[in-house]
Amino acid sequence: MLENLSTEHRNEKTMNLDEMNIKEVLQSMNEEDRTVALAVEKEIEHIEKVVRVVIQSFEEEGRLIYIGAGTSGRLGILDAVECPPTFGTDDKMVQGFIAGGLKAFTKAVEGAEDREELAEEDLKSIGLNEKDTVIGIAASGRTPYVIGGLKYANSVGASTASISCNKNAEISKYAKLNVEVETGAEILTGSTRLKAGTAQKLVLNMISTASMIGVGKVYKNLMVDVQSTNEKLVERSKRIIVEATGASYEVAAEYYEKAERNVKAAIVMVLLQCEYGEALEKLKEAKGFVKKAL
């Protein structure tokens, strides 16, 4: 029942929200937002377990699939679409599905989240299999679309995890691993795009970033698989080579072109003074880890 969910409770500190001036509203929001990271901190052990499973999927050439409705679905898609430019993944490695399809990203699709079968259809469309990990996201922890997706994922042997913002969430029953970040009452009653949405974004950031580190997408704290899809990222790529090798900007730019804009290869070439082909071979042997290739 909705009334039993902490995310649906009224916030005692903001009973007079409509009477506050603008500054008071903003201060109230900021005060509540400060509690979110602390709530996430309590779930780090559970988040770690999810990351380990995602890394295993990636190592087996499986995928990470997010499913959710409304804000939760949008956050999953947001995290997924940032992976190719940041970590050089293909667009299949991390995917996000939202109840109602992509059109629901910009406009609510009435009733879509209440249909379990829609998630099964979405997951069947990508040939979900036992190598994949499916993460169901729902602030309330009871969204039928997410439950349907988790049920189907379990039926094909995929790894499953859930992210919710209430304890003892319904979706937790359908996932092997659970992250339950209790964010409590929102300043605007039931508006889970606020603290709950912020918590979900923080958790998704953790899962995708830590998983990518785990499969060699990062060297030191540099995103060495960055894709140079625009002028800003071309410059960032050259700066990454400078930071990783200590070479001058001019040398970094030279090796960036020699390596056919492959930042990892350029770093190996500079540090080992080898040719492009040899750098690629070393990276292949090291399964993409720059440190091991060196």
From Swiss-Prot:
Pathway: Amino-sugar metabolism; N-acetylmuramate degradation. It comes from the Bacteria. Gene3D superfamilies: 1.10.8.1080, Glucose-6-phosphate isomerase like protein, domain 1. It holds the Pfam family GKRP_SIS_N. Keywords: Carbohydrate metabolism, Lyase. Residues 54-217 form the SIS domain. NCBIfam families: N-acetylmuramic acid 6-phosphate etherase, PRK05441.1, PRK12570.1. Specifically catalyzes the cleavage of the D-lactyl ether substituent of MurNAc 6-phosphate, producing GlcNAc 6-phosphate and D-lactate. Belongs to the GCKR-like family. MurNAc-6-P etherase subfamily. This is N-acetylmuramic acid 6-phosphate etherase. It comes from Bacillus cereus (strain 03BB102). The lineage of its organism: Bacteria, Bacillati, Bacillota, Bacilli, Bacillales.
